[in-house]
C-alpha cells in the first residue's frame, strides 16, 4: 500500500490540562480517590479535550456494515440477509442502537461497506459498496488490497466528519453476519492464541457450532500463514470491511483529536489492529465494557484496558459503548460541578 496515512502522528494529549484536572480532583469535597475510576476518566478526558473541565455534549455514533463470505462455511446461526434488513432497522429507528442514540441525543450515521444485496438503496444510509461482502477467507483472502485500503479510508472519513461536526466522543458500531468469526480469526493472529479459546456463540451458535467455527478459523490461518507482525495482511486476509473501517475510524479520530469509546469484542479487535498500525492512537481509546464473547477478556488485557461495564453483552452495534456514555457524562459533571473544599468551607483533611 502506498497511502499509509494511518502511520501519521496522532493529536497530542494536553498534559497541562491533565495536571490541572488532577489538581482539581484533589480539592473536591470528597476523600481523594473515593470516586474510583470516574476520577481517572475525568482527568483523561481533560487531556483529550485540552481543558480542565471536559464535557461530552456531542456524541457521534457510526455503524459500519458489511457481509462476510466465510458464512458459506456454516459458522452463523442467522442468514446473511439479516445484515441488509438491520440497515433498514437502524435508519428506521427500531434497532437497539437507534433507541440508545435517541436517548443520548447522539448523531447516528450508517455506512454500508458491502452487503450481499447489491440493489439495496436506503435513505439515510451511505452505500459505499466495496463488494458484495468479503470473499470466503477459508479459501482465499477476504479482501483485495484496494478493498482493504478503501475500507480503512471509509472509517477515517467518518471520523473526520464527526470531528468537523464538533463531536467530543466517537462510537463505532458494526453489523455483519459472520463478523464474530472474522474478529476471532484476527484476534487469534494478533494475540498468538488458539482460535478455540477466542471463539464464542456470536448470534447464537450451540457448542458444536462454536467448535466448527474454531476449526474453520484454524484451517484458514494455516492457509494464509498469518503473523502478528503484519497486522495489515491479517486484516486483509481474514478481516471484514466493517472491522477495517473501525480501525481506520479509531486512528482517524486520534489524528483529529476526538476521543473514542470502544464497544465490544469486534470493536476491540479493530482497536487492537489500530494500535498495531499506529501505537499513538491507544491514548485516545476508552473501553466501554467486557462482553460475553470468550475472547474479549484477552483482547482487553492485551490493550491494557479497564472497561467500565460488565453486563454480559454480545449484541454489537456499538450498544455497549452507548450504554456507558452516561457514566462518562456523570464523571465529567462530578469533576466540573462539585465544590472544592474552599468553596464549600469544608475541612480538607481528617481531624
UniProtKB/Swiss-Prot annotation:
Keywords: Cobalamin biosynthesis, Glycosyltransferase, Transferase. Pathway: Nucleoside biosynthesis; alpha-ribazole biosynthesis; alpha-ribazole from 5,6-dimethylbenzimidazole: step 1/2. It holds the Pfam family DBI_PRT. Gene3D superfamilies: 1.10.1610.10, 3.40.50.10210. The keyword Transferase applies. One of its GO terms (molecular function) is nicotinate-nucleotide-dimethylbenzimidazole phosphoribosyltransferase activity. It catalyses: 5,6-dimethylbenzimidazole + nicotinate beta-D-ribonucleotide = alpha-ribazole 5'-phosphate + nicotinate + H(+). Its EC number is 2.4.2.21. The active site is at 317 (proton acceptor). GO terms for biological process: cobalamin biosynthetic process. The keyword Glycosyltransferase applies. It is an enzyme of class 2 (transferase). Catalyzes the synthesis of alpha-ribazole-5'-phosphate from nicotinate mononucleotide (NAMN) and 5,6-dimethylbenzimidazole (DMB). Belongs to the CobT family. This is Nicotinate-nucleotide--dimethylbenzimidazole phosphoribosyltransferase.
Amino acid at each position: 500500500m502506498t497511502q499509509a496515512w494511518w502511520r501519521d502522528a496522532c493529536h497530542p494529549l494536553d498534559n497541562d490540562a491533565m495536571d490541572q484536572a488532577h489538581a482539581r480532583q484533589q480539592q473536591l469535597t470528597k476523600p481523594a480517590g473515593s470516586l474510583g475510576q470516574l476520577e481517572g476518566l475525568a482527568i483523561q478526558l481533560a487531556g483529550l479535550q485540552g481543558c480542565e473541565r471536559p464535557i461530552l455534549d456531542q456524541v457521534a455514533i457510526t455503524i459500519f456494515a458489511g457481509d462476510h463470505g466465510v458464512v458459506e462455511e456454516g459458522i452463523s446461526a442467522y442468514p446473511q440477509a439479516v445484515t441488509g434488513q438491520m440497515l433498514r432497522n437502524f435508519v428506521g429507528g427500531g434497532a437497539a442502537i437507534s433507541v440508545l442514540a435517541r436517548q443520548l441525543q447522539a448523531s447516528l450515521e450508517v455506512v454500508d461497506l458491502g452487503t450481499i444485496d447489491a440493489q439495496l438503496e436506503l435513505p439515510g444510509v451511505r452505500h459505499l459498496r466495496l463488494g458484495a461482502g468479503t470473499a470466503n477467507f477459508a479459501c482465499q483472502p477476504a479482501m483485495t488490497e484496494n478493498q482493504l485500503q478503501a475500507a480503512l479510508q471509509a472509517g477515517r472519513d467518518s471520523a473526520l466528519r464527526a470531528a468537523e461536526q464538533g463531536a467530543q466522543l466517537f462510537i463505532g458500531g458494526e453489523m455483519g453476519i459472520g463478523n464474530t468469526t472474522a474478529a476471532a480469526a484476527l484476534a487469534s493472529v494478533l494475540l498468538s492464541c488458539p482460535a478455540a479459546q477466542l471463539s464464542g456463540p456470536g448470534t447464537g451458535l450451540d457448542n458444536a457450532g462454536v467448535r466448527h467455527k474454531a476449526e474453520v478459523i484454524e484451517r484458514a490461518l494455516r492457509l494464509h500463514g498469518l503473523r502478528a507482525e503484519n497486522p495489515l495482511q491479517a486484516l486483509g486476509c481474514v478481516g471484514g470491511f466493517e472491522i477495517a473501517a473501525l480501525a481506520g475510524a479509531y486512528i482517524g479520530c486520534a489524528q483529529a483529536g476526538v476521543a473514542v469509546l470502544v464497544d465490544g469484542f469486534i470493536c476491540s479487535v479493530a482497536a487492537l489492529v489500530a494500535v498495531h498500525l499506529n501505537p499513538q492512537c491507544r491514548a485516545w481509546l476508552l473501553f466501554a465494557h467486557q462482553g460475553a464473547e470468550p475472547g474479549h477478556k484477552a483482547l482487553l488485557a492485551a490493550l491494557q484496558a479497564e472497561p467500565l461495564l460488565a453486563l454480559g453483552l454480545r449484541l454489537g452495534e456499538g450498544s455497549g459503548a452507548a450504554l456507558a456514555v452516561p457514566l462518562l457524562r456523570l464523571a465529567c459533571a462530578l469533576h466540573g460541578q462539585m465544590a472544592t473544599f474552599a468553596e464549600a468551607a469544608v475541612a480538607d483533611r481528617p481531624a
